Swiss-Prot record:
Residues 1-27, 229-233, 303-308, 353-373, 457-530, 581-646 are cytoplasmic. Glycans are attached at residues 133, 278. The gene is slc44a1. It is found in: Cell membrane; Mitochondrion outer membrane. The chain crosses the membrane at residues 28-48, 208-228, 234-254, 282-302, 309-329, 332-352, 374-394, 436-456, 531-551, 560-580. The keyword Transport applies. Belongs to the CTL (choline transporter-like) family. This is Choline transporter-like protein 1. Residues 49-207, 255-281, 330-331, 395-435, 552-559 are extracellular. One of its GO terms (cellular component) is plasma membrane. It comes from the Eukaryota. It comes from Torpedo marmorata (Marbled electric ray). GO terms for biological process: choline transport; ethanolamine transport. GO terms for molecular function: antiporter activity; choline transmembrane transporter activity; ethanolamine transmembrane transporter activity.
Amino acid sequence: MGCCGCGSEEGSVRQWKPLEQRSCTDVLWLLIFVLFCIGMAIICGFAIASGAAQRLVFGYDSYGNICGHKNTEIKDVTMSGLDHTDKKYVFFFEPCNWDMVHLKILSVALCVTKCPDMDLKTLEDVRNFAKYNGSRLCLYNLDPTQYTSKNSKSCPILPVKSSKPIPFFHRCVPMDSGCKINFKALTTFVSYNSVLQRVITGVMTSKEIIVGLCLMSLVLSILLMVIIRYISKVLVWILAILTIIGSIGGTAVLWWLYADHKKTLKLDPSQGDVAADNVTALLVCAIIATVITVILLLLMLIMRKRVALTIALFHVAGKVFIHIPFLIFQSLWTFLALAFFWIYWIAVLLLLATAGYPQKKDQGYVEFKVSGPLQYTWIYHLVGLIWISEFILACQQMTIAGAVVTYYFTRDKHNLPATPILASMCRLIKYHLGTVAKGSFIITLIKIPQMILVYIHSQLKGKENACAKCMLKACMCCLWCLEKCLLYLNRNAYIATSINGTSFCTSAKDAIVILVENAMRVAAINTVGDFVLFLGKLLIVLVTGFVGIILLNYQRDYTVWVLPLIIICLFAFFVSHCFLSIYEMVVDVLFLCFAVDCKHNDGSPGREYYMDKSLMEFMDESRKAMRSVTGSGAEMKSMASGSDNA
């Protein structure tokens, strides 16, 4: 009996070999995934059918009328059902009065023919604007001649700031930058923490630097991907030395900037809170950088003897990239697919926020609300975000696995398909989408409790006792560890499926058996490969962060350091991880293929190895490396059960 309720697919011992004649795997899960996606489409259709798309794009007034359209009357709502064909823009009486909790403007909204393009300081200015531009800014039941102090409550709050419409969304946005940034609700939200308010301002003023450095990290990641293909002993040491110099140099610069900012603040205390925040942020960053540098130096001391092993590993992986160069761009296609889906998801979320049916409020205005079970569609939509995102990432892993498996088990590399990546992708779509759907759903089941615990933790912050806090964090830690283990298991299950064409559960079981049989060698390879890739990621973060520090240092008068710098470094790490994780996947595929190769072949006529000489030499070196760590008396288990033909 197979795992997860799956029956065993074969009564005999598993014959590991790449099957040309494949069959569809996990069809039931593919059907479930398709039905789930249909549900996502139905939610989108409901939002559009209820008028949410029109209300989102064209906007609507406080009486439920959609701007730029001829509207139907809403029962018991005065001034509804108006013809606003020539009134295409939404104008707010109090555009800066935001409710950040419910994400809406607490203001009367009207449809107008033109946004005020000048400051209107008096009601006479409002009246003249209506007279000469035909755009009435007071309630619909008032004639411009009635724009007097007697009817001031039916007119916008004075002064009316000049505004312009948002492209494609037809809302009048005030040109006053202070109004854009300092929303009343946002000010209320951060009023208890003025530091947060200054940090938000710092991010807004540093947005060009943040975007520029994020693009820089993308270029550095692609460049490092190309360099690793041709890695040698010299390049490994250069990478290590550059990382060490970058860590020490970056730490020294942070301490120097901290001392400089502190001295400047002491000489001129009038610089205010922004300068004090910068000093505090620099101190925190300097301490963190110091700790990271010390840990890095210790790791380099421990790993220095494995440089030769590292070179051999990346020489082997580099050959794969030479024969399948489009592997380098696989992360780019995945990123584009994720970006497209996330844009769609956010658009539907915005549609859901404006979906529903009109309900009359006490003031006589209209609010659109969803009642009954439909009000919980956002939960379904949130699960869709996790599952489909994980599905896309799993498709990348299966595609890479299929291409590398084809490379490994093709004896004559000149007979490889013209485009192994495309061939692997077609094989995935034709046979194994159900397996990918099942694997990604398992990760989704772990992420949902994680999100619930994070939400509970944020809601109980400052209220929970020490015991509850400890238990909550322990649960979050356990789920995090479980997620990492399942991600690793999923990755190897996809590799096994690429080799044998078996279902997810069968592939996972077979992969576990192989990994357990070769646990020591797995540890050696993962330690060596992951460490070098970590150095590469760290180097990109250090270079990007260092340039960010230098640039932000010239904006010390109005920019708080901490959040812009964190955003830059996190994005740099995310981008570098996305690209360099391809190498991790390639190494994992090569290892599992090697283990299967050794288990079923011994080099004799008719049972020749698929591996090339360089891979065999690397595996022998990895065995020696682990033997030196475990001691001369700890002999590694043979790759082939019951034989010693590794």
